Amino acid sequence: METATILSIFILGLLLGVTGYSVYTAFGPVSKGLRDPFEEHEE
C-alpha cells in the first residue's frame, strides 16, 4: 500500500475512535457522573 493510503486510514480510524469515545462519554453510563454547571447556578 502507499504511504498516503495508510496515513489516511490511520487518521480516519483515530477520528472515529475519538468521536465514538466522546459520544459514549456524553450519553453512556458515564454521563450520570458528569455535573451540569447550568443546574448548579439557577437563580
Curated annotation (Swiss-Prot):
InterPro entries registered for this protein in UniProt: PSII_PsbN (IPR003398)
Gene Ontology CC annotations of this record: chloroplast thylakoid membrane
Plastid keyword on record: yes
Any GO BP: photosynthesis
TM helices/strands, residue ranges: 4-24
Location within or outside the cell: Plastid, Chloroplast thylakoid membrane
Primary location group: plastid
Topology of the protein relative to the lipid bilayer: Single-pass membrane protein
Cysteine-cysteine disulfides: none
Family the UniProt entry places it in: Belongs to the PsbN family.
Role summary: May play a role in photosystem I and II biogenesis.
Listed name of the protein: Protein PsbN
Protein source organism: Emiliania huxleyi (Coccolithophore)
